[in-house]
């Protein structure tokens, strides 16, 4: 997991700068898990959420998280419809949540797994982005077939869903693969208050079936659904 804590500030924060953002205030005594690096914030830990009503209702709105004494704790993606009310983007008061951050996180994830991609056969599925592990909560990306193949993305939280365009741009730039497909888990998306969508985000859709080799065993895989059957 990235070092979210670099540059953490607890006092003297310029709150005037953030007057257009949501402010999540954590109940007294409930900030311990955040101080220890826990990236999920549940409703039971939140004292109040201040900000514009439309931002409160929009899944993935960026919020400042503060303690009951108004000390900065984190920046997070807020979702009033989710059991996990907020997912931390960064514990660093100096790190803005913007296109540059998203692209930087995607690049770091791809660079981390570059060796695995190089070793993989063309008919192997490679995990390229692993959600919280890469500082991109709720984002899963698998690659198949290299630059001429397909990237399959799952946006399982409001924060990454709100940054979908920037994420796809960064994935294409980092892999050279222009075929990007979104596959969703209906139960997860529904629980996050997100629309149920499947389809190409860039380039072509995958075929109904591709050949997958895993641990020496061959499967027929539908990249669009994730379903596989033993190859005969």
Predicted feature descriptions by range:
Residues 82, 159-160, 227-228:
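Short, surface-exposed beta-strand-loop junctions and turns on beta-sheet-rich folds
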Residues 98-105, 159-167:
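Short amphipathic alpha-helical segments
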Residues 16-145:
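Non-catalytic accessory regions of SAM-dependent methyltransferases
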Residues 129-136, 140-142, 163-232:
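Non-catalytic substrate-recognition/targeting regions of SAM-dependent transferases
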Residues 6, 10-11:
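Short hydrophobic alpha-helical segments enriched in small aliphatic residues
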Residues 148-151:
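Active-site beta-strand-loop-beta-strand hairpin of nuclease catalytic cores
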């Amino acid at each position: 997991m990235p070092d979210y804590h670099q540059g953490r500030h607890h006092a003297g924060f310029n709150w005037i700068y953030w007057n257009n953002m949501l402010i999540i205030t954590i109940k007294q005594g409930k900030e311990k898990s955040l101080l220890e690096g826990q990236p999920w914030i549940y409703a039971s830990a939140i004292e109040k959420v201040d900000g514009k009503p439309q931002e409160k209702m929009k899944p993935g709105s960026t919020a400042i998280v503060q303690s009951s004494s108004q000390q900065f704790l984190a920046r997070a993606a807020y979702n009033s419809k989710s059991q996990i009310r907020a997912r931390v983007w960064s514990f660093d008061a100096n790190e803005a949540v913007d296109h540059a951050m998203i692209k930087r996180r995607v690049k770091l994830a791809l660079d981390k797994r570059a060796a695995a991609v190089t070793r993989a056969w063309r008919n192997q599925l490679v995990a390229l982005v692993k959600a919280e592990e890469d500082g991109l909560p709720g984002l899963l990306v698998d690659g198949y077939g290299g630059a001429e193949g397909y990237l399959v993305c799952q946006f399982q939280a409001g924060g990454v869903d709100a940054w979908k365009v920037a994420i796809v741009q960064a994935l294409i730039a980092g892999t050279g693969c222009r075929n990007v497909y979104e596959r969703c888990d209906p139960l997860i998306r529904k629980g996050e208050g997100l629309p149920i969508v499947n389809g190409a985000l860039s380039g072509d859709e995958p075929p109904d079936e591709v050949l997958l080799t895993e641990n020496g065993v061959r499967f027929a895989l539908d990249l669009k659904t994730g379903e596989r059957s033993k190859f005969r």
